[in-house]
Amino acid sequence: MRKHAKKIIRIIKMKLKLVAVAVTSLLAAGVVNAAEVYNKDGNKLDLYGKVHAQHYFSDDNGSDGDKTYARLGFKGETQINDQLTGFGQWEYEFKGNRTESQGADKDKTRLAFAGLKFADYGSFDYGRNYGVAYDIGAWTDVLPEFGGDTWTQTDVFMTGRTTGVATYRNTDFFGLVEGLNFAAQYQGKNDRDGAYESNGDGFGLSATYEYEGFGVGAAYAKSDRTNNQVKAASNLNAAGKNAEVWAAGLKYDANNIYLATTYSETLNMTTFGEDAAGDAFIANKTQNFEAVAQYQFDFGLRPSIAYLKSKGKNLGTYGDQDLVEYIDVGATYYFNKNMSTFVDYKINLLDDSDFTKAAKVSTDNIVAVGLNYQF
């Protein structure tokens, strides 16, 4: 009996170690568990995707309810010669909480870009991609569901996923310094109906250095604002002609521990709330802080705690106001590298006020629960 018991214990320990290794690999990879569709004669194509089945519980009617979606994408590359490689990536999101009669309403292209990699001399790509400021913002955007929302925003200049960006990236500083990476980016003008999602011509820079689990980085971006953005100036809307962001971050990722913090300031850039037409306001200035701590247990559990705050400055007659402030407590349990479940509790620290009511800034808590299958 003892021999059988010891054998069972060894098997359990082995499985726990396999789960831990799988989860660590999953978290470290940009696109995880991709299915290799084709790999021959220097041409490679990987398919990846996930189904994110989740529900929000909140007193905020705009947040409460089903939030299920699915994503599908591919990454491909072709070896042109021993020094030059072509690559491309596309990713799309399908909403799972819409009725069939609504069709593809709110489905969206998340990524779509192509480029060339020149051996140790770096890579260049163009299309819909992440802005270089997100190189720092990504360090704290790791919570089970929420997080990364004080200043990194989609289609808001170069702080998140955005369109029309030409990006140069260099890894390990021309192959000379391991862990030292930098990027330069240019974004062309995008004048859309919604002023808060428009941008003028701009550029961005980022640099990060990682060594034995420790990381430090900084990013800067500056853009012209469109005429419509400047004309939309109001009590709560920024009037400046340029949008600007700088950000710095620190992180530690080793020994099953993940710690990260970022600080940033933005000018005429960060969106918040909602006006009468359903468009977001744009803050004159914000000061933003994010910090997160996580631990990966060998049996698959990854608890997480974070604090996030964004302070809006010079908001017309309202002066300085908190735009975002909450504590996030959550956990993810990985059954294996393909299946996980999570719970995430966003404890909103904002109080109801004349400002939150006028700007329609939510002050309610949210609990998110869900299952995630990915390949």
UniProtKB/Swiss-Prot annotation:
Expression induction or repression: Expressed in high osmolarity conditions (at protein level).
Protein's cellular compartments: Cell outer membrane
Main location: membrane
Pfam family, any one: Porin_1
Ion transport is among the record's keywords: yes
Top-level taxon in the UniProt lineage: Bacteria
Loss of function: phenotype: Slight decrease in virulence in male BALB/c mice.
Protein name: Outer membrane porin OmpD
